Design a protein with these regions (language model features):
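Acidic, Gly/Pro-rich loop/turn segments at junctions of secondary structure
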Residues: 86, 97-160, 167, 215, ...
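Short, small-residue-biased leader/transition segments that mark boundaries at the very start
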Residues: 1-5
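A late-sequence structural motif
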Residues: 75, 226-270
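Secondary-structure junction motif
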Residues: 117, 146-147, 161-182, 249-253, ...
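A short LG(V/I)-centered, amphipathic sequence patch enriched
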Residues: 9-28
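Alpha-helical linker/hinge and terminal dimerization helices associated
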Residues: 13-16, 35-57
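Hydrophobic hinge/microswitch elements
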Residues: 98-111, 117, 170-228
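Central regulatory/effector-binding core of bacterial HTH transcription factors
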Residues: 60-122, 192
Length: 273
């Protein structure tokens, strides 16, 4: 009776029955189904208002992020350090996956955000919060004979020993497609999922590779790697951060997106002499 009384009062106030009560079975009526949608929206609005009034240090909960391997190894350490400093109570759950796998995880609500490296993706169910073009380049050990050349042809490249990322990764597939368009094929002697490890192996003189520029930028600046100029194969991927269109943008998600945007703006800003 204690539980039934408020429902009865609500039904009287709305002027419509919310439940069908047949014996011990209780089901929502058509009016009940309609009201349920509004009730859920109202509760979500209250939760959002409560979250908006919290200080970052007070926000808790969990943030689940899927990332591309190269994004993880390059951008994540600094990003996580800054995020944890702002949101010390938030639990971070991270995983790496292929780009297709990450988008599927968003669709099935296994993760809150997906940080990909791929061609520009336009999907009506996803919101793209960050989009940064990233060139991919051929690299060789410093002192390699091809490093002294102004340009290198694809025909010359395929004669070299290569270490590449696994098939199914966006920029590896783009390389294979570029070669196929010129009637060529490249068979690496080693395939590896870690772009950062490939960079180190090329530095050791173990072969050539094809990697995002942000992975090799420090080694290029240090002179331990050389970038090869290959006019017939220009590849650009996009570093993109997504969330699902139907998902409420939580304070935890907003904080992460803001830090990614901030880092992107800082890296794009011209350095002053």
């Amino acid at each position: 009776l204690h539980d039934a009384l408020p429902i009865s009062q609500l039904e009287a106030e709305l002027g419509a029955p919310l439940f069908d009560r047949v014996g011990k079975t209780v089901r929502l009526t058509g009016a009940g189904e309609t009201f349920l949608g509004y009730a859920r929206t109202l509760l979500a609005t209250v939760e959002q208002a409560q979250a908006a009034l919290q200080l970052p240090q007070q926000i808790s909960g969990r943030l689940r992020i899927a990332l591309a391997d190269s994004v993880c190894s390059t951008f994540l350490p600094d990003l996580l350090q800054r995020y944890h400093a702002q949101f010390p109570q938030v639990e971070l759950v991270l995983c790496t996956a292929t780009d297709d796998g990450m988008l599927q995880m968003l669709t099935t609500n296994q993760v809150d955000l997906a940080y990909t490296l791929d061609h520009p993706l336009l999907q009506p169910t996803l919101v793209r919060a960050v989009d940064v073009p990233e060139p991919v380049c051929f690299i060789a050990p410093a002192g390699h004979p091809l490093a002294a050349r102004d340009t290198v042809s694809l025909e010359e490249l395929v004669q070299q020993e290569f270490l590449l990322t696994e098939r199914g990764m966006s920029y590896r597939d783009a390389l294979d497609q570029c070669l196929a368009a010129h009637g060529l094929q490249l068979q690496p002697y080693l395939e590896l999922g870690s772009a950062a490890l490939l960079c180190q192996m090329v530095e050791r003189g173990m072969g050539l590779s094809f990697l995002p520029e942000y992975i090799v930028r420090a080694a290029l600046a240090a002179g331990t790697l050389a970038r090869l100029n290959v006019p017939d194969c220009r590849v650009e991927m996009h570093r993109q951060l997504f969330y699902h269109r139907d998902k409420w943008l939580t304070p935890q998600m907003k904080g992460f997106i803001a830090l990614v945007r901030e880092g992107t703006a800082q890296s794009a800003a011209p350095t002053q002499a």
